[in-house]
Design a protein with these regions (language model features):
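A structural signal for small-residue-enriched, beta-sheet-centric alpha/beta enzyme cores
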Residues: 1-88, 92, 98-404
Length: 404
């Protein structure tokens, strides 16, 4: 497997682009994106577990219930959620994309991100869609990534290539997410494309498995958005032997898909609203993956721990506290905790009790931009990683002014 450039247009047959249509007031901010496959695709997705779901999710689920899609249309600046006419407008967006691209509107994945509860203006999308469709190209992934951003500070895209048999297969993705990120499938949107030939059931299985160990392991602020969507389209243009079962080809594909999702997840976590540090909680020595996952997520979700990391304070008690209320079946007297970064590693807790360590050295470890919290449970061989960021003053400022 090799990481490559190209995002959602790295795979054969995919075009993408973004444009400012007028939903957002700032004309320098693109707010409408499209991704298009020249040929029909197998499609699959996973969505928010929030009981309040954005209208685009309701429409997309219906559209890809048959496992087929050919395009994505997504706006930023308005979530199209909790609106009386939301579903009607989400469907209208599918029609607009279908008309502009010459495809069936039922083959369109629709998504929106932005403020909840505001009426979505449809005219700007209608007016801009033909121009956007004309701009789509094989180098348009970055513009599409920009167009789906809200409070993000960087565009997020990633791609890899692998070999299946004698064929080169590519997988690429773009994502957005900076706040309201605590998925259980960040607002989290991710669109993945691949030229792999793979059946719909196996594609759905793969995207669910990849999400479980990547996107579902992120927490920026503990809020699960109404619009979280992870969708994948596979057009088969790599011409590999179609993957229809859990064979070696499927395992290779899943590993590559997970790598793309992991990279995007880490970019999202590190770009959390107001964040200055990417946090990774690596839990090892668990009796099973479920236990490792539960502990890792509990630690990464702790607001007290996030604040301590911002302050570069090696307050390991907050780690043990989060482990204690995680609800996992563990022996706290076996737990070891360390903090690690590019500077080095400092051990702070052994067998559930504090040990002597240099606070000065610990502060230097925590001064780096990427911090790993190592939690060793000493009860088995399972492990899991969770991703998050520190909690800063700017998080409050950003969300206090979000609608202004």
């Amino acid at each position: 497997m090799q990481f490559i450039e190209g995002g959602v247009t790295a795979a054969k047959g995919f075009l993408a682009g973004g444009i400012h249509c007028g939903i957002r007031k700032n004309k320098s901010k693109a707010d409408l994106a499209m991704i298009f496959s020249k040929t029909p695709c197998a499609a699959a997705g996973v969505y928010t577990q929030n009981l309040v779901k954005g209208a685009p999710i309701l429409v997309t689920r219906k559209n890809i219930a048959d496992g087929r899609a050919q395009a994505v249309i997504c706006n930023s600046g308005n979530a199209n959620t909790c609106n009386a006419d939301g579903e009607k407008k989400a469907w209208r967006m599918c029609e607009i994309a279908g008309e502009a691209l010459g495809i069936d509107p039922h083959d369109v994945i629709v998504a929106s991100t932005g403020v909840i509860g505001q009426i979505l203006p449809i005219a700007p999308i209608e007016n801009a869609a033909p121009a956007l469709a004309a701009l789509l190209n094989e180098n348009g992934s970055n513009m599409a990534a920009k167009a789906i951003m809200t409070t993000d500070t960087i565009e997020k895209e990633c791609a890899v290539k692998i070999t299946l048999g004698d064929k080169e297969v590519r997988i690429g993705g773009i994502s957005k997410g900076s706040g309201m990120i605590h998925p259980n499938m960040a607002t989290m949107l991710c669109f993945v494309t691949t030229d792999c030939a793979i059946s719909v059931p196996m594609l759905q299985k793969a995207i669910k498995a990849a999400a479980d160990t990547t996107f579902n392991m992120i927490s920026v602020d503990g809020d699960t958005s109404t619009n979280d969507t992870l969708a994948i389209m596979a057009n088969g243009e790599a011409e590999n032997e179609e993957i229809t079962e859990e064979n070696e080809a499927y395992k290779t594909f899943l590993e590559a898909l997970t790598a793309v999702c992991r990279k995007l997840s880490m970019m999202m976590a590190g770009d959390g609203e107001g964040a200055t540090k990417l946090l990774i909680c690596k839990t090892t020595g668990a009796k099973d993956w479920e236990t490792a996952k539960t502990v890792a997520k509990s630690v990464i979700c702790s607001s007290l721990l996030k604040a301590a990391m911002f302050g570069e304070d090696a307050n390991w008690g907050r780690v043990l506290c989060a482990i204690g209320y995680a609800g996992a079946d563990i022996d706290i007297n076996k737990v070891d905790v360390s903090f690690k970064s590019a500077y080095g590693q400092v051990d702070v807790c052994v067998n559930g009790a504090g040990i002597n360590f240099s606070e000065e050295e610990a502060a230097k470890v925590l001064h780096e931009k990427e911090i790993t919290i190592l939690v060793e449970l000493n009860s088995g061989d399972a492990e899991a990683d969770a991703f998050g960021c520190d909690l800063t003053y700017d998080y409050v400022k950003i969300n206090g002014d979000y609608r202004t």
